[in-house]
Amino acid sequence: MNSRRKFIKNLTAVGATVPLVANIEAKPKKNKGPVILCSRGEVWGEKVLKPGWDILANNGKLLDAIEVSSNVTELDPEDTSVGYGGLPNEHGVVQLDASIMYGPTHNCGSVAALEGIKTPCSVARLVMERTDHIHIVGKGAQNFAKLHG
């Protein structure tokens, strides 16, 4: 039978090891280059990823590659998942959401309920790069997008 004394003693021992474990650094794996993923499978994969890979192959910026690849889907009227071909809400209005994140700086930007703009990923990137905000929604997101071209 465990006593309270034994429980507290064991708890203290666990608590003392946490700082030791926290100071252990993970060894990063060797970078084998960027990875761009597409959840659209074989049918859409090459179409979506090729523009991004072309940018990276010419020593372009990773965020440019991600944005351009996202724009392919957003601008395709036959893709009903996001963007121009996105399905309207219950009021018959297409509202789009997007977010973008940049690992090295931990910066991010996002928009939601964006109307009348075909490339929400590009607007999300503008939010990340040109504001102190992380998330802009609705009419505010639309006004921001129009203000930035």
Annotate the PLM regions.
Residues 2, 9-17, 27-149:
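Alpha/propeptide regions of enzymes that mature by internal proteolysis
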